[in-house]
């Protein structure tokens, strides 16, 4: 049975980890969300979230977006390539309902899988 946990090892925790991804990322974007990815040597994917107050004003909206992004990553972690991912959002993401946000994230995860296979 596949474990769908979200332990500490699956998170980007330090600024150094985020900087590594920002240096030479592969991008997958929608109008509201961008997911940056860069291969790692760990054998499993990791995720970091940057939800700026500038783009999403209300804390409960930022928390909802982070919660949905983590859940989407958790459910797709076994299909994802061993990469470090950073999720960035733009203005307008707060207007998306949960279903639309989940579908957009799923589409971007699939795009990263295709990009990883192509390279």
From Swiss-Prot:
Any Pfam family the entry gives: Ribonuclease_P
Top EC category: hydrolase
InterPro entries: Ribosomal_Su5_D2-typ_SF, Ribsml_uS5_D2-typ_fold_subgr, RNase_P, RNase_P_CS
PROSITE patterns found in the cross-reference section: RIBONUCLEASE_P (PS00648)
Gene Ontology MF annotations: 3'-tRNA processing endoribonuclease activity; ribonuclease P activity; tRNA binding
GO BP terms in the entry: tRNA 5'-leader removal
Gene Ontology terms: cellular component: ribonuclease P complex
Domain of life: Bacteria
Catalytic activity field: Endonucleolytic cleavage of RNA, removing 5'-extranucleotides from tRNA precursor
Entry EC number(s): 3.1.26.5
Keyword Transmembrane helix carried by entry: no
Protein purpose: RNaseP catalyzes the removal of the 5'-leader sequence from pre-tRNA to produce the mature 5'-terminus. It can also cleave other RNA substrates such as 4.5S RNA. The protein component plays an auxiliary but essential role in vivo by binding to the 5'-leader sequence and broadening the substrate specificity of the ribozyme.
Quaternary structure and partners: Consists of a catalytic RNA component (M1 or rnpB) and a protein subunit.
NCBIfam families assigned: rnpA
Family matches, as HAMAP family: RNase_P
The name this protein goes by in its record: Ribonuclease P protein component
Gene name linked to the record: rnpA
């Amino acid at each position: 049975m596949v474990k769908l946990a979200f332990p500490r090892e699956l998170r980007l925790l330090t600024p150094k980890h985020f900087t590594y991804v920002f240096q030479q990322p592969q991008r997958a974007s929608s109008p509201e969300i961008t997911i940056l990815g860069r291969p790692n040597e760990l054998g499993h994917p990791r995720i970091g979230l940057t939800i700026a107050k500038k783009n999403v004003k209300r804390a409960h909206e930022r928390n909802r977006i982070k919660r949905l992004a983590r859940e989407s990553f958790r459910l797709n972690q076994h299909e994802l390539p061993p990469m470090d991912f950073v999720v960035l959002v733009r203005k307008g993401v707060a207007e998306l309902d949960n279903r639309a946000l989940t579908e957009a994230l799923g589409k971007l995860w699939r795009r990263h899988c295709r990009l990883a296979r192509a390279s």
